Amino acid sequence: VYDKLVETGKRKETILASIEAQDKLTDELKRRIEACWDATELEDIYLPYKPKRRTRAEIARQKGLEPLAVIIAMQREAHIREVAGRYVNGQVKDADEALAGASDILAEQFNENERCRNSVRQQFRRGAVISSKVVKGKEEEGAKYRDYFDFSEPLKRCSSHRLLALRRGEAEGILKVAISPDDEACVESLNRLCVKGNGECSKLVASALTDSYKRLIKPSIETEFAAASKQKADDEAIRVFAQNLHQLLLAPPLGQKRVLGL
């Protein structure tokens, strides 16, 4: 626990320095970061400020499409294609390209939204399934993992020893392991959060949400849960090792023979 707190403290310092260097560190944001000791929540807070590679959303911003994304997000404009036509220029060839770029911006914003990410996390907790398949051609080499060649089980019911076996099989290149929630339930929960009606803008928001979920949010949250399951398996391995070592150290040194002293 102490090591985790130290690690989180160092991470907070790095995050504060990064945001301050961008001249985006407000007093409220600083207080929030300083008060946060949950590593996952801390990364969610930092995500909108995290330096990005050249993403689809960043390309769209450079084309001047962020104001269009704002209009779509408000979900009030009834003639959005007509509005999108105003953004056609040397970099944007038509209204469809303008709407696609604005949707890319929205998808990235949804991925950086804590409520959206927590909504998907909740669905992972409720119904994620951990599954494994044997890597083609590894059947004979990985015979000891035969029980996991075509395996699936709700993650919340998967025991530590199964997690340990799955992660060992994955590390040895025998198994492909995946953690997946109910995709439909995840998208529905996001729609409940963000979609405000059934107009054209709302349809674009719903489409951007689906794209954000499949392309950005789901892979990110799956990585989180994979790391958590690995930690659970590692903790179990340490516990079993400690238990076995304890029994070994307490065992009579000469078996059934009586010992007066050593």
What would you call each of these model-derived segments?
Residues 1:
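Catalytic phosphate-handling regions of large nucleic-acid enzymes and associated NTPases
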Residues 4, 8-253, 258-262:
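Duplex nucleic acid-engaging cores and interfaces of nucleic-acid transaction enzymes
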